[in-house]
Amino acid sequence: MPRKGYTKRQEILPDPIYNSKLVSRLINKLMLDGKRGTASTILYDAFDRIKEATGNDPLEVFEQAMENIMPVLEVKARRVGGSNYQVPIEVRPDRRSTLGLRWLVNYSRLRNEHTMDERLAKEIMDAANDTGASVKKREDTHKMAEANRAFAHYRW
């Protein structure tokens, strides 16, 4: 542990268009090689596609998608008496959103649509409708935690 205490988390400014910190964090997750302009263009184009396809506010669709993606439980490896147990633990709120954004971006990149903004828009719309690869990842995480519920008493 550090002797001088912990550093404060850097405050993330909300994005200029939707005034949302979550959107700003998504832009940061999308960004490759420091190209924030490219990442924000991709995101705003994806939001335009969502507005065209659904007719709803893209921020509301995105927030619904994030609600469907963010995990409540996960498993963490714990070594007890020479064997490793997968111990289910609750996920902290900040980690919930971090995992949700990470899964959303990763599974968007794996999709087969032509452009990244199209992939991201489709993944967000799928997640808002409780389908898609990122929602499946959340379900798999919850299943793993449920399967290892017997080891919950090893929680620390």
Swiss-Prot record:
Gene Ontology cellular component annotations, sorted alphabetically: small ribosomal subunit
Q: Does the keyword NADP apply?
A: no
Task: Name its GO BP terms in alphabetical order.
Answer: translation
Q: Which domain of life is it from?
A: Bacteria
Q: Does the keyword Transcription regulation apply?
A: no
Q: Which NCBIfam families match?
A: rpsG_bact (TIGR01029)
**Sorted alphabetically, which PANTHER family does this protein's record hold?**
RIBOSOMAL PROTEIN S7
Protein name (Swiss-Prot/TrEMBL): Small ribosomal subunit protein uS7
Q: Which organism is it from?
A: Leuconostoc mesenteroides subsp. mesenteroides (strain ATCC 8293 / DSM 20343 / BCRC 11652 / CCM 1803 / JCM 6124 / NCDO 523 / NBRC 100496 / NCIMB 8023 / NCTC 12954 / NRRL B-1118 / 37Y)
Ranked from the top, the taxonomy reads: Bacteria, Bacillati, Bacillota, Bacilli, Lactobacillales
